[in-house]
Amino acid sequence: MNFKINLDKKFLSRTSLYILNITLILLTLNFLSNNFPLVDEALLRISTIYLLLSLLIFNLPIKKIFYNLKEKHEEKNSFYTLLIGIFLVLFSFILLLSTKIVLILLSSIPIFISGLDLTLKGIKIKRKEFYLLSFFSLSYIMFYLLIQTITVFWHIIQRFSIVFSSSIGSLIGKSMVLGPTVSGLWIVIIFLILSIVGFILSSNKKIQIIKFLIAIVWIFIGWIIYLIVISFIEFKLKNDVVNLHIVLFILCLIPTLIYLIKSNIEEERVINLNIKKINIKKIIKNGAVWALLFLFLSTLLLSSFFGLKDSKSNEKTKIMFYGQNMLGSWDIPEYGKYGREASGMFGLLPIYLNASGFENVLLVNNITTFLNSTQPVYENITRYVNLTDHIKIIESNEVTADLLQDIDIFVVTNINKSFFPNEKQVIWEFVEKGGSLLVLGDHTNVGGIQEPLNDLLKPIEISFQFDSALPLDSKFNWLTCYQLIHNPITYNTKEFDEIQISVGASLNTSVNAIPLIIGRYGLSDKGDLLNQDISYLGDYQYNQGEQLGDIILAAATYYGEGKVIVFGDTSTFQNSALPYSYSFIYNIIFWLDSEQTATTKLLQTGISIVLLLATLILVFTYKKTRIPSAIFPIAFTLALSISFLVNPLLIPDMQISGNVVYIDASHNERFNLEPFTDKSINGLILNLNRNGFLPIILREFLQGKIEKSKIFILNAPTQSLTTDEIDFINKYMSNGGIIILATGYPDKEASNNLLKKYSLDILNVPLGPFPYVEENPEEYENEPRFVDSWPIVFNENQGRSFYNFSWYIDYHLMVFVKQGKGGLLLISDSQYLLDKNVESIYDYWPGNIILLKNIMDEFQTLEE
């Protein structure tokens, strides 16, 4: 190629700005797509805003803009163009700051580019790269939407990455199995889309075709060089992968920029529309207008969830659990079992589901044997939780059509014995006719579950691999390593800690399966048959030949008129996870019970694809009349915004009532949401379970939910309660609700207004740990223990002390104030309810467990 470059200052200035603009937009799209992931989401957002602000600083002559805004304009079109441009730029920043939805965040970029372009045009400055960048960014976001909604495309890209990286590895004598995130294919795709758009917008395509193909080849050469480099690196943490992504970015950037600089990109040709002379007939005949409409409808269809109505809205959904030949138990937390084994496994799941109005059935071989092994032994200390109050237990040696006749969802968990052929036929006929199947498994063939599970799942081509799916980020576990595909099951998942996956198997699926949860920065750690004592687990390290990146942790698919969901890990559904994950589980059950089928989904997808193809045909063939290109990203974003406003109405929020306890996490409370640490609240959760309560972590202060609960717990909130929230709390207690507030003097500021309302105060007199014991702590273990206590002052005519001690004077550490049918319990220790003081997997304090039990009994008398 002939790379003669004019070296005059003007050209260098324009070329430098051209390169800078393209580079900053490429970086922005990669940031928002999580191709350069940052641990802190806020930091990612700030970085994106800084990149866009840099674009404004380098491109906008601020003085000239102010001058144009102040002066009277003879050319009103230029003035309106300037105003519209400024509005779009501001609107793009509003989008960036107001949502966490990746698609909306991405859609802000073409709006920003269009706004910047219009602003410059309003002051008679032309930047031809903005037309290219607007077209490119919109094309990329449309591609991203297709990957998210038509997951066969995701599978194709994932498999191409694995095959390509394996091929390069075999050529250099290295074994590599890399998903597109680790291999960098997602970054490569962004550059490919930019190059393709540049070619489409270039004039003299016959001349440009050679340059275009050379650029594509060099992008792939850059990718190959990158793969060779990383083949010699031992990956342990996510940062090991991330730190090298910038190398690939540069390798792809150089040939792309050279190609674009030498390409003759066409400038946008727009006929100014005079609003006063709008002709409806001309608009109808304008192909660009129809392209705009088709893009809007296609985007709306792709991003919206239709066909999600309950299949039996007037009847209870019936769920059958297969309770035999399985690894695991149906135990529930009970007194007498503490520490690591206290939680049990799956016994609380049907109890939670029953509280949400679902009817549960458990299928076992022998009812008597099952109850003798599962039902907790009655002790004087505990309120007896009868499992049969929440689930109907039926007896049968095999699964039959009659048993499944009235069932909506059939749940199979960790089976270690294959179903008989006639049972498998019954199950799949049940699904084919509209029933739903939920299959839960675990890692490395633990307990011999892999073959029976894979045997069951053959008709849908999903299988459990002999591995452990591990996150690459050891500090944050899976929280920074997930990717959720756009679908109704995960749509309401606001925080990744709701998923609660721990260590399970990765799934091998067909291209028809929907990858619900992807371990984007995950590792498929192959099992070791020699490690029988530790469930065949591998070495918890990356070894060459193991898949790195984009492993599937959970998948869904359609079969006939029915639906199937498969989880490679059971942790989400276990007792200890339910307070965090139940909202997510509720969405799973809702989707399985919905009317959406393969036919309705295929119809919705097919129509949207036809509309999108029609858009492309009109854009590239109808050139007589154009409309401003800025309208296309606006239409796209409008369609996305409408769908994201409508979708929550199509997916019901979690419904649960009864003995529900909400633990607030919406006021920056001082406890750790990560389970089983010193600062976690799992010990509190276990003791609530033992007393028949169903605790749930509440991430938003939702009055409609709280009013249906029995107890609302705030543990050292650091964000102040609002006046409306305090008024609601007062009404909640008047109607019988109980508030438990644990806060010491250092944290009381956020709760001060609530305390004052009930004549309560916490004095600045540090009492420290109580009782203070240096030797023989076992002598005091049946007494309550405080970590950092402070004295409470209260009106003895309104409240009463639940716990106090005397040291010259009386110090009250727990006070209850009655309000209507309920009341407020104040604990003057921010750490009293934490695991380190109540119960952890390694230790527990009997005195606090007994005191919590007495408090629960006291609350029961209030109800009576």
Enumerate the language-model features and the residues they cover.
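Short, surface-exposed patches at the edges or C-terminal ends of soluble domains, predominantly
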Residues: 275-864
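Hydrophobic N-terminal alpha-helices or hydrophobic patches in metabolic proteins across all domains
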Residues: 2-287
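Coil-to-alpha-helix initiation sites in intrinsically disordered, low-complexity, charged segments
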Residues: 1-2, 163, 583, 597
